[in-house]
């Protein structure tokens, strides 16, 4: 089942790589061009800078996932949801709208009010998330994470000796831990998996992300489409010695490689250029072999 229907949008085998553009209604978010708190301005940005430039999906974040900031409660996210709802109601163009949240309560409210899918960076740490998405019959992105709402992506900090076995923990590579985290909670029929690129914890290393790139095809063994979020990430900056606003070229190179190695969805702030890079990776890469 390496394909999923997301509100009529086919994702995975038999479909072109899909582009997920980003809108943040959170002032804490690290990339300023995507941050809006006025629904009219946000809707204009979505229409002109995301959908018109080639975004198939618009992912709306209610808070920054940056570990430097405190995690919002579900109630605090719900307080910001009205801006997100009013924004998508004002958008004139067609797209699939995704709500980024770790809370099933927030996902349920967003889906009931017009959102089409969920992006869960905590990988079903909220035990009600999978059931909520199944009840709404929507696609959901599950990022590789420990079962902890406060530590998205921090799979290397899990006590794997206790969760699996001391022998498994001693032999496991970083990607083995990502795959184990994704497999721990049941995947819904419409789950898309995310291998958690980027600096999600203090112990995450550049070597970890290199290993993930090298083994990206392994995530297809989960029999689900794969989403990668690599746009302007710090690990790319480390490789090329560039700050965030100078990392577009590095991001595009990584995008083509990711699609070549099996990625089905690319999450990005730079929609038009990322779309082009993804199409090149698709046309000349190995993902269709």
Regions found by a protein language model. Give the residues of each.
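An active-site-proximal structural segment forming one wall of the substrate-binding cleft
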Residues: 48-49, 84-91, 107-113, 173-185
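Short coil-to-helix leader/linker segments, especially the first N-terminal amphipathic alpha-helix
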Residues: 1-10
